[in-house]
């Protein structure tokens, strides 16, 4: 067995960014105290989910990488001796911004980053206004605790993204996330959507024989314009083993931390029994898989 202890931080956020960061730092410390070697945070964790409406001035929230957040969290990672997965609003250059996951090594250095590839543009999720699609492909990030296939939120609905990370050598899939129910959907539909959200990621776990770590935010965040009822984030952060089995799960409204043990050697055992990679017919898929809309 090759056990990796992974910490997950699920929390709500407010408009007070310094307070959000202090809350995150406290929860990261709690994970470390519980033995976590790797800690994963939610999508855009420093602030509220600002993409509920379009406002150019909100681009002032973006920061360079490396920058203030990588310095702050890097110092904490070095102090605690942990690997840390961040999710930041990256300012690449004037007018070009990305939704970027950053992996911090135990020594506080940047191990690598991933720019979100799939960008939504739906009611309350107007991300295309803020984020340029990623241009770094689906390359896992090498760290002292393993090879991490880091993706971001909307990427989690696409089996191609998970498969690319798996084929490129990821030992686990990690999804910082900000997703919840919006005013246009009845409560019953939101429950169906929430279950589907978890189910599709458990499917990626099964299809690729990899553990999945998904960290979502929780709480109600109002629409600053008052035009909608805002978003009630689902919470439900979870971890699976390589057969999609649930190892840990937060409640919808639960705030705090969980530390889960992941056996990185189990992928070998599972893939021997379910040799999906062996039986793929890459000779037969041809250009069909490249079609955008099908027939």
Describe every region a protein language model picked out.
Residues 116-130, 254-271:
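A short, polar/charged loop-to-alpha-helix boundary motif
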Residues 17, 26-106, 110-113, 179-203, ...:
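Cys-nucleophile CN-hydrolase/nitrilase-fold catalytic domain and related Cys-dependent amidase chemistry
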Residues 138-168, 177, 267-295:
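Cysteine/selenocysteine-centered motifs that mediate thiol-based redox chemistry or coordinate metal-sulfur cofactors
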């Amino acid at each position: 067995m090759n056990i990796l202890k992974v910490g997950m931080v699920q929390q709500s956020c407010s408009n007070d960014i310094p307070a959000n960061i202090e809350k995150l730092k406290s929860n990261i410390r709690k994970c470390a105290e519980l033995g976590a070697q790797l800690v994963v945070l939610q999508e855009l964790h420093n602030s509220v989910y600002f993409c509920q409406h379009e406002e150019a001035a909100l681009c002032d929230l973006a920061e360079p990488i490396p920058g203030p957040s990588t310095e702050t969290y890097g110092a904490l990672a070095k102090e605690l001796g942990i690997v840390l997965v961040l999710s930041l609003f990256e300012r690449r250059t004037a007018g070009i911004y990305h939704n970027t996951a950053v992996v911090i090594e135990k020594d506080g250095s940047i191990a690598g980053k991933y720019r979100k590839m799939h960008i939504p543009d739906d009611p309350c999720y107007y991300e295309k206004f803020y984020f340029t699609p990623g241009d770094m492909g689906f390359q896992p990030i090498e760290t002292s605790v393993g090879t991490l296939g880091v993706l971001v939120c909307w990427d989690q609905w696409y089996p191609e993204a998970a498969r690319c990370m798996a084929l490129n050598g990821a030992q686990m899939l990690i999804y910082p996330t900000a997703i919840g129910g919006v005013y246009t959907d009845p409560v019953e539909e939101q429950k169906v959507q929430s279950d589907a959200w978890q189910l599709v990621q458990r499917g990626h776990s099964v299809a690729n024989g990899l553990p999945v770590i998904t960290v979502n935010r929780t709480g109600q965040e109002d629409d600053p314009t008052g035009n909608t009822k805002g978003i009630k984030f689902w919470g439900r952060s979870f971890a699976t083993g390589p057969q999609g089995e649930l190892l840990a799960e937060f409640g919808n409204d639960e705030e705090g931390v969980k530390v889960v043990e992941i056996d990185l050697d189990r992928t070998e055992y599972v893939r021997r029994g379910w040799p999906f990679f062996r039986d793929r017919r890459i000779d037969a898929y041809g250009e069909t898989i490249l079609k955008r809309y099908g027939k």
